[in-house]
Amino acid sequence: TLNSYIVKGDKTAIIDGVIGWDGVSDTLYEHLEKNDIDPKAIDYLIVNHMEPDHSGWIKDFKNINDDFTIICTDKAAKLVHSFYDDDIDIRVVKEGDKLDLGNGKVLSFYPVPNVHWPDTMLTYEEESKVLFSCDMYGAFGMIKDHYFDDELTEEEVQLFEDEGIRYYSN
């Protein structure tokens, strides 16, 4: 996904951030404003992984709101500290840990390292039964006119696997 999500109880969380360039973060702030959400009132950033297309805006966000907590895995916490100031408030979560936002909104967290990125985790909102799957099921593009992997030739499967290995080895 390239989307960010808001979960609002008594407290407010953004799940998955955005890139920090090309005006994308401005678009996020515009959408927050349209939904009557003040960026200064956001309590939590749920960082499902630190890939730059989801975390590149954290520094910019910190200039707007310096009173929030990042929720992430231990691997992501190390990356947050290496990319940004050490004074960012971080809560490290493990499998099954919960964050109660109030008003029936409870998030639970499930690390799935290396499914997409070394620090990947999934976030589940219990009341609505929505799984925020990060980039776990995401894919960009397709090979020729094939939408499903059972339509691929052996050569196309090999190309897909080679590209996956190239991606992870970088």
Model-derived regions, located:
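Conserved beta-strand hairpin/beta-sheet module of binuclear metal-dependent hydrolase folds
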Residues: 1-35, 122-133
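Short coil/turn connectors at secondary-structure junctions
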Residues: 9-11, 42, 66-67, 86-88, ...
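Short catalytic-loop micro-motif centered on adjacent basic/acidic residues
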Residues: 13-16, 44-47, 108-109
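Active-site environment of divalent metal-dependent phosphoester hydrolases
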Residues: 22, 50-55, 78-79, 116-117, ...
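Active-site metal-binding motif and surrounding structural segment of the metallo-beta-lactamase
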Residues: 24-71
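Short, conserved acidic/polar surface loops in the N-terminal third of protein domains
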Residues: 26, 55-60, 81-85, 119-121
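Metallo-beta-lactamase
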Residues: 72-170
